């Protein structure tokens, strides 16, 4: 069992599942403040955690399945290249997790089921081909990160989905920016591996400008939840800290050409953006 949890990257699954829970709680706070008839189901909330954990684990397992040749060189101790789990077992286990997660999602409501099904398809395509495609790989990671919060809100149906659209967009934009910056950081190693990332395709400078554009867009859009009276003044205060980190991250990638530092700053910006939604709801 320990080996299969390692294949799933259980720690990563838990963090994603926690993000789903945050989505549930934020959507509940927003909706319950507008209507006294909104209730929070502990059972459905538990299912959200389990579904995100399982589907994320399925995606991670499938990623290892397709990366077997690369991992033989770069990560020989991983479950598949080390021989702890056979290639076929890893594939069947990942498919089992996908099916279980999607089935549980439809038990919550049809909207959750549709999102889980669509995200599973994106994860499969990402592991198979999208991650090797310039920009579309970055966009896939951005969407999947943002949709984790959206999935949590979907427990309340379309109203919950609409309540978290801005959080979804901010998380997606910021993640895409950081993913491109990470590709700029890894450009030397990626060239040696024959990868086709955005910086390799158009150059580090142009890719940095694209990353900065996504970061700026996320920053400029950050006041929207307050202006629309979705979140309170506390949100505005904390998100301002996130915006400062976004600005410094952009400066580091454009002015200092320091992709590693910029990537870390984008990560801090995303953390404070998440905190701002929690305190502002």
Swiss-Prot record:
<comment type="pathway">
    <text>Membrane lipid metabolism; glycerophospholipid metabolism.</text>
</comment>
<comment type="similarity">
    <text>Belongs to the UbiA prenyltransferase family. DGGGP synthase subfamily.</text>
</comment>
<dbReference type="GO" id="GO:0000287">
    <property type="term" value="F:magnesium ion binding"/>
</dbReference>
<dbReference type="Pfam" id="PF01040">
    <property type="entry name" value="UbiA"/>
</dbReference>
<keyword id="KW-0808">Transferase</keyword>
<feature type="transmembrane region" description="Helical">
    <location>
        <begin position="207"/>
        <end position="227"/>
    </location>
</feature>
<comment type="function">
    <text>Prenyltransferase that catalyzes the transfer of the geranylgeranyl moiety of geranylgeranyl diphosphate (GGPP) to the C2 hydroxyl of (S)-3-O-geranylgeranylglyceryl phosphate (GGGP). This reaction is the second ether-bond-formation step in the biosynthesis of archaeal membrane lipids.</text>
</comment>
<keyword id="KW-0443">Lipid metabolism</keyword>
<keyword id="KW-0444">Lipid biosynthesis</keyword>
<dbReference type="InterPro" id="IPR023547">
    <property type="entry name" value="DGGGP_synth"/>
</dbReference>
<keyword id="KW-1133">Transmembrane helix</keyword>
<dbReference type="GO" id="GO:0046474">
    <property type="term" value="P:glycerophospholipid biosynthetic process"/>
</dbReference>
<feature type="transmembrane region" description="Helical">
    <location>
        <begin position="14"/>
        <end position="34"/>
    </location>
</feature>
<feature type="transmembrane region" description="Helical">
    <location>
        <begin position="149"/>
        <end position="169"/>
    </location>
</feature>
<keyword id="KW-0472">Membrane</keyword>
<keyword id="KW-0460">Magnesium</keyword>
<protein>
    <recommendedName>
        <fullName>Digeranylgeranylglyceryl phosphate synthase</fullName>
        <ecNumber>2.5.1.42</ecNumber>
    </recommendedName>
</protein>
<dbReference type="InterPro" id="IPR050475">
    <property type="entry name" value="Prenyltransferase_related"/>
</dbReference>
<feature type="transmembrane region" description="Helical">
    <location>
        <begin position="259"/>
        <end position="279"/>
    </location>
</feature>
<keyword id="KW-1208">Phospholipid metabolism</keyword>
<dbReference type="GO" id="GO:0047295">
    <property type="term" value="F:geranylgeranylglycerol-phosphate geranylgeranyltransferase activity"/>
</dbReference>
<feature type="transmembrane region" description="Helical">
    <location>
        <begin position="235"/>
        <end position="255"/>
    </location>
</feature>
<dbReference type="GO" id="GO:0005886">
    <property type="term" value="C:plasma membrane"/>
</dbReference>
<feature type="transmembrane region" description="Helical">
    <location>
        <begin position="38"/>
        <end position="58"/>
    </location>
</feature>
<keyword id="KW-0812">Transmembrane</keyword>
<keyword id="KW-1003">Cell membrane</keyword>
<feature type="transmembrane region" description="Helical">
    <location>
        <begin position="95"/>
        <end position="115"/>
    </location>
</feature>
<keyword id="KW-0594">Phospholipid biosynthesis</keyword>
<dbReference type="InterPro" id="IPR044878">
    <property type="entry name" value="UbiA_sf"/>
</dbReference>
<dbReference type="InterPro" id="IPR000537">
    <property type="entry name" value="UbiA_prenyltransferase"/>
</dbReference>
């Amino acid at each position: 069992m320990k080996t299969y949890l390692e294949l799933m990257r259980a720690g990563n699954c838990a963090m994603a599942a926690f993000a789903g829970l945050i989505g549930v709680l934020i959507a509940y706070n927003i909706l319950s403040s507008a209507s006294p008839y909104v209730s929070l189901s502990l059972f459905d909330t538990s299912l959200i955690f389990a579904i995100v954990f399982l589907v994320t684990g399925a995606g991670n397992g499938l990623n290892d399945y397709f990366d077997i040749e690369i991992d033989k060189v770069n990560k020989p101790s991983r479950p598949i290249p080390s021989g702890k789990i056979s290639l076929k077992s890893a594939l069947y286990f990942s498919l089992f997790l996908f099916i279980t997660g999607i089935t549980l999602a439809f038990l919550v409501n049809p909207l959750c089921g549709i999102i889980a099904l669509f995200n599973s398809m994106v994860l499969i395509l990402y592991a198979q081909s999208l991650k090797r495609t310039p920009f579309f790989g970055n966009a896939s990671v951005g969407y999947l990160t943002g949709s984790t919060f959206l999935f949590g809100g979907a427990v309340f149906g379309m109203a919950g989905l609409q309540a978290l659209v801005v959080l979804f967009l901010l998380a997606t934009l910021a993640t895409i920016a950081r993913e491109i910056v990470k590709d700029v950081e890894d450009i030397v190693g990626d060239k040696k591996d024959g990868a086709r990332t955005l910086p390799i395709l158009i150059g580090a400078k142009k890719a940095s400008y694209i990353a900065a554009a996504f970061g700026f867009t996320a920053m400029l859009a950050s006041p929207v939840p307050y202006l629309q009276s979705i979140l309170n003044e506390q949100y505005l205060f904390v998100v301002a800290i996130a915006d400062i980190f976004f600005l410094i991250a952009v400066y580091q990638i454009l002015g200092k050409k320091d992709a590693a530092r910029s990537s870390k700053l984008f990560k801090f910006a995303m953390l404070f953006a998440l905190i701002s939604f929690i305190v502002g709801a």
